[in-house]
Amino acid sequence: MSTMTKPEAAATNGLQVLQPSGWPQPKGYANGIMAEGRLVVTGGVVGWDVAGRFGDGFVAQVRQTLENIVAILAEGGARPDHLVRLTWYVVDMDEYITNLKALGKAYREVLGTHYPSMALVQVVRLVEPSARVEIEATAVVPR
């Protein structure tokens, strides 16, 4: 079975990080998370502001997307540390890789240091032509 990477995490957010014995520790995500509680699920969230305008550049769009996710979570009584999964869709994988350091900084500033299970997928395009990234989020609020 697995062990929690941060024992204090279960006390504050009810989540257990699943890390198979002997596997290398992932950096910036979790291999799996176990949770019990109320499910909060977003649709595909893009990086536009309340006026429907996209920021300039990939990192700005990612930051706004993460801020938008936090706003949606709050509507359901969830916090960033309740996230159990993020699925990222990007139109340019090289753009993502080139900006890893800045993306990590933006992620930590918006979501903190909680890293849920994540997947990253490159797609041909997104529904919104100006969007460079779209993220689906799943959170579990402890009962």
What are these regions (language model features)?
Residues 1-84, 90-143:
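N-terminal presequence-like segments and the immediate start of the first folded domain
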